[in-house]
């Protein structure tokens, strides 16, 4: 078979040259659009469901929330296994699907199953939430917010309400999760003595706040040919709105929240903390969406963070160098480029030292980009992107390619030289054919082994 391929190539040299040029152009075009990541996707498609039930014990969360969800999703088509974990006030269920399952279809199927068990959850349970689709190695960038003059609550507010929305608007970003700092919240500190004096309970205050914290739609008011929308504005926007909420009327006298409680801004109870070294800070983790290109998304995130930095107060420091996944990819690409350059130099030096012929060196050098782009086309055909493992494999393979090219070119060069010294020289094509066929099987088999 190898002899027939060599013979056909020698008889159709122009076609082979044109095909090689087209092959190189196609490989370069495909290379530009291939996704780049640190590692290939090594985890099967999965859907993560989290359900919050404030105050619920782990045993109750497992029995009343986790188990019903597990039972509902177990029969979903394509499910390989279901894992779960229950903690204080939180249920987490991980539904793992078979390889090849479309993750978006899987999410739709799981969502339909969840709806059938929502009514069975205990009162006060939040609606189940499916976490965003992220890659198995989805951490793109980690940033931190620090300040010598501002409180951790202010830093967390900046992260949650200024940085996070702008980053989520970028294509390829799946989630932005901040840890550390203090989450700002309205706190109503009830006084048992004042509650008893007005014969009220904590539930009365809670219900009053829930009723008042809404904007009520009204009708239309028509006047002078114009329609005006009537809306009851009750949404809480300040501490005074909370203080002035009416809890109850006693003898036609309103009892306000301020009469039975102290109202202030405070920090949510912490579940963990964040720091850079030993300095408290707000640390944000940006994760990329499933299938997104790591380098492209990272560059967009860095541009956005640079723009955000200009809008932050001067006493707030935004550090975007805590972690950068793209560094690993860029390092792998740099190593591959270095391997290409070193391989080309070694081939050139070896061939010039032993053969002293420019044409042989050029032919061997051409084999490097041709083989490399051939590998890129093969990866693309199998749906595999560029990552540290494929780049490492290509870098190692370059050595084999160069070795094979040197052996072939050296043997052809030697046979041509002997043919020129012969009293009855044979046709050049026949000499090249015999020289290449002579070592072809050995080279191919040795390369495969």
Labelled PLM ranges:
Residues 205, 334, 358-361, 387, ...:
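Helix-terminus/capping and membrane-interface signal
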Residues 27-31, 317-318, 345-414:
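Hydrophobic transmembrane alpha-helices and their membrane-interface caps
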Residues 16, 85, 222, 364, ...:
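The H+8 position on the N-terminal DHp helix of two-component sensor histidine kinases
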Residues 1-345, 353, 386:
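Membrane-proximal extracytoplasmic
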Residues 344, 348, 443-448:
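Hydrophobic alpha-helical segments of membrane proteins
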Residues 16, 176, 195, 328, ...:
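Alpha-helical transmembrane segments and their helix-entry boundary regions
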Residues 10-14, 333, 337, 341, ...:
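Internal alpha-helical transmembrane segments of multi-pass membrane proteins, especially GPCRs
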Residues 329, 333-334, 409, 415-445:
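Helix-loop junctions and hydrophobic alpha-helical segments within the transmembrane domains
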């Amino acid at each position: 078979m190898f002899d027939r391929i060599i013979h056909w190539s020698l008889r159709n040299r122009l076609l082979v040259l044109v095909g090689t040029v087209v092959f190189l152009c196609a490989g370069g075009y495909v290379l530009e659009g291939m996704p780049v990541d640190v590692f290939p996707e090594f985890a099967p498609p999965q859907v993560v469901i989290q359900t919050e039930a404030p105050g619920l014990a782990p045993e109750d969360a497992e029995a009343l929330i986790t188990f019903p969800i597990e039972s509902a999703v177990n029969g979903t088509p394509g499910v390989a296994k279901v894992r779960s974990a229950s903690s204080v006030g939180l249920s987490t269920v991980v539904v793992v699907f078979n390889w090849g399952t479309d993750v978006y279809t899987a999410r739709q199927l799981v969502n339909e199953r969840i709806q059938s068990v929502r009514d069975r959850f205990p009162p006060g349970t939040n609606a189940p939430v499916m976490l965003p689709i992220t890659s198995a190695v989805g951490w793109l960038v980690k940033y931190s917010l620090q300040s010598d003059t501002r409180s951790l609550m202010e830093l967390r507010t900046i992260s949650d309400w200024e940085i996070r929305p702008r980053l989520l608007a970028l294509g390829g970003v799946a989630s932005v999760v901040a840890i550390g700092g203090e989450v700002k919240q309205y706190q109503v500190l009830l006084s048992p003595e004042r509650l008893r004096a007005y014969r009220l309970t904590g539930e009365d205050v809670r219900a009053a706040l829930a009723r008042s914290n809404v904007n009520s739609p009204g009708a239309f008011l028509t006047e002078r040919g114009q329609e005006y929308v009537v809306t009851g504005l009750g949404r809480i926007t300040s501490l005074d709105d909370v203080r002035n909420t009416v809890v109850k009327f006693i003898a036609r006298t309103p009892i306000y929240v301020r009469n039975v409680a102290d109202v202030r801004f405070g920090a949510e109870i912490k579940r963990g903390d964040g720091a850079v070294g030993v300095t408290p800070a707000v640390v944000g983790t940006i994760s990329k969406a499933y299938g997104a290109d790591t380098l492209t998304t990272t560059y967009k995130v860095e541009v956005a963070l640079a723009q955000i930095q200009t809008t932050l107060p001067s006493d707030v420091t935004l550090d975007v160098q805590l972690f950068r996944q793209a560094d690993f990819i860029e390092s792998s690409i740099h190593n591959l480029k270095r391997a290409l350059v070193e391989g080309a130099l070694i081939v050139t030096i070896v061939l010039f030292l032993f053969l002293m012929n420019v044409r042989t060196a050029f032919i061997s050098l051409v084999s490097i980009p041709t083989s490399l782009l051939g590998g890129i086309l093969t990866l693309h055909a199998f749906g595999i992107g560029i990552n540290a493992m494929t780049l490492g494999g290509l870098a190692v393979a370059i050595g084999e390619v160069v070795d094979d090219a040197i052996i072939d070119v050296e043997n052809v060069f030697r046979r041509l030289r002997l043919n020129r010294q012969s009293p009855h020289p044979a046709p050049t094509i026949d000499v090249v054919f015999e020289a290449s066929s002579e070592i072809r099987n050995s080279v191919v088999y040795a390369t495969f082994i």
